[in-house]
């Protein structure tokens, strides 16, 4: 949390947030691990229009949302973070930068983050460990297209999987040229919101999974389906394999993981390709260098490892750990450890 001009700014609160009338909850994006149910919240909410709209569709209904001009009057500026549609970093008084989840790579219709210089940087470190290095998106798309082509030649349908909000819309856009293409309802719900918000994903008059199934369309193989990421042992995937001999392809940054503790994250699919909505290790290092802060706080994922590396190359860096009831105070930064 940040104390600023007599107000407490909670950064991506999920449960632990200040609920006084002088509090501001900043929501960097609408993934459910970055938002909260506002039933007892009396403060203001700062988020992009897209985040508020998508959160609403997912059952999180916020009132008292700050306008851009109101935020600006408080010295608060939201900047595209490149993670998902509507994702934002937060710059406070031109000095303190909170990245939220961030990606500096362009992907399909989504532009990578270009963040400003700052004095204090609070940076995510999901992949903040050496060894996490992603190939270019062009390489991943080429490999996926070659794989789909090979499977099509064998008459096998393909299920392309990613998180239903964010990754799945990128997959829809990147692989829209395959036909026929079907969209799982969980993905289609978010796709339609993207289109309402002016993003053309390129799949018009999309056919939903249930409609295709009930009308025998899935029996006419091969085909491509965009679906939420799930393992091969889920009921849905077991059904698709049993009845249609479908092949699963998951897209996740964890595909490059070599540590045994992360093997479960990418081994339960037929194929896994490294496409992430986060920065890899080198991207994170370059991001810190471009922002050139005098102090860096790392959070999430490999926060300890990334802070240690930054210290080894000359930065004043330390990790922020899990939430607890103990509050440590810095002159400008309040955070739970």
Language-model features: locations:
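Active-site regions of enzymes building and remodeling cell-envelope glycoconjugates
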Residues: 21-29, 40-49, 59-78, 118-121, ...
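Conserved residues at the C-terminal ends of beta-strands
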Residues: 28, 48, 124, 184, ...
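Structural beta-sheet core signal
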Residues: 97-98, 160, 183, 225, ...
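Short acidic low-complexity segments
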Residues: 8-19, 68-73, 203-221, 235-239
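C-terminal regulatory/interaction regions
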Residues: 212-337
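His/Asp/Glu-rich metal-coordinating catalytic cores
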Residues: 1-24, 30-159, 166, 173
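Active-site-proximal loop/helix segment associated with metal-binding centers of metalloenzymes
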Residues: 84-92, 102, 106-107, 118-126, ...
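Binuclear metal-ion centers of metallo-dependent hydrolases, dominated by the metallo-beta-lactamase
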Residues: 1, 115, 129-208, 212-217, ...
